[in-house]
Amino acid sequence: MANVSMRDMLQAGVHFGHQTRYWNPKMKPFIFGARNKVHIINLEKTVPMFNSALDFLEQKAAKKGKVLFVGTKRAASDAVKEAAISCDQFYVDHRWLGGMLTNWKTVRQSIKRLKDLEVQSQDGTFDKVTKKEALMLARELEKLDKTLGGIKNMGGIPDVIFVIDADHEHIAIKEANNLGIPVISIVDTNSCPDNIDYVVPGNDDAIRAIKLYLEAAATTIKAGREQDVIVQAEQDGFVEEVSE
């Protein structure tokens, strides 16, 4: 599991919340105080809560659980995609379509269309139609890939979602709640911590902070996956005892 210290969090600015006038009173237990009308998050709470979330993530990864990273705002989207790809998981980084989880049957049809178009773009089909038709198909492919490219190989709903900004991604959280999918979320001082299984109080705007959370999550998932490989090898008799 990744080990994130209080110093790491301080350097990344995890402790800086939003302006005091935008606060959500439900975040009061996680707020240390205010400085220059900006709330300061209590990292003595954040560190163990984040470690608890990572521990859960590692357990899920060790059982081949599918993790969906969600972060569609500009500050998070690139880092979300990068982290998910680095640990061979899934992501939504552009826009959350209503029903992305709760209406999976329809989403699956759109994913099939995306994959068909990908094949057609490679096998010369686009060259056999008129320029106008080829352009329309290329645009459709681009649009579908932007929205569904990060989940096209997920093969069903995820086992856990990891969210950057609970307020911005409230629809994703609600859908996960409806399906009983555990939610890990970074929750800033302006957001509501309700209906989140693993609340991580922290700055959800600073790119350095966002990268810190995501890199730690990706490292943890990889560690969990390695555990699964070792256990599997032991069960299959591939691991030999090394005598002294």
From Swiss-Prot:
GO biological process terms held by the UniProt record: translation
Protein keywords: Ribonucleoprotein, Ribosomal protein
Listed InterPro entries: Ribosomal_uS2, Ribosomal_uS2_bac/mit/plastid, Ribosomal_uS2_CS, Ribosomal_uS2_flav_dom_sf
Keyword Ribonucleoprotein part of the UniProt annotation: yes
Protein name: Small ribosomal subunit protein uS2
Lineage: Bacteria, Pseudomonadati, Pseudomonadota, Gammaproteobacteria, Alteromonadales
Gene Ontology cellular-component terms listed: cytosolic small ribosomal subunit
GO molecular function: structural constituent of ribosome
Protein's UniProt keywords contain Ribosomal protein: yes
Domain of life: Bacteria
Pfam families xrefs: Ribosomal_S2
Family: Belongs to the universal ribosomal protein uS2 family.
